[in-house]
Amino acid sequence: MNYYIGLYSPNKAKRDIDEIMQSMNFKDIAIQMEEKNKAARFFRKLLCVAKTWFVLKKGDLLLIQYPFKKYYSVLCKIARSKGCKTITLIHDLGTFRRQKLTAEMEIERLSHTDYIIVHNEKMKGWLEEHGCAVPMGNLEIFDYLSAAEPCREDEE
């Protein structure tokens, strides 16, 4: 079975991936509840992580959108202990975003996943340059879903 964690986010990219995962018949293992404050969000995410222990089975696949504040490494470790594979889709790196993580901390955290999906060659190069040995795929896109009509380069 294929799973993802669809925690509501005001971030368009994360919402787009949730929509894409649903269209690909991935199951959302998030716990849906109204969040009134930070404490509620914290406990919802904690419950969601705990739920993965009971839901995941050997051979399953878990897609994690990154950054996944708190518990990212725990999710990967739970999946691995259950015989599951994890794919991490990186939207942004904490090393650049808030400068709370060093490059070494970020690479150590990402080393727990089985596969990484990045936006572009620059991000992939940066990760490799800083020691990331996890296999990676490159989307070469920035926006996932758009109402705009695509155009070919020769039409521009």
Where are these regions (language model features)?
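N-terminal pre-catalytic "stem/leader" segment of glycosyltransferase-like enzymes
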Residues: 1-70, 74, 82
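Short beta-strand elements of ligand-binding domains
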Residues: 64-65, 87-92
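A short, active-site helix/loop in glycosyltransferases that binds the activated sugar's phosphate group
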Residues: 98-101, 113-136
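Short beta-strand->alpha-helix junction loop in the catalytic core
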Residues: 138-150
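Conserved donor-binding/catalytic core segment of Leloir-type glycosyltransferases
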Residues: 153-156
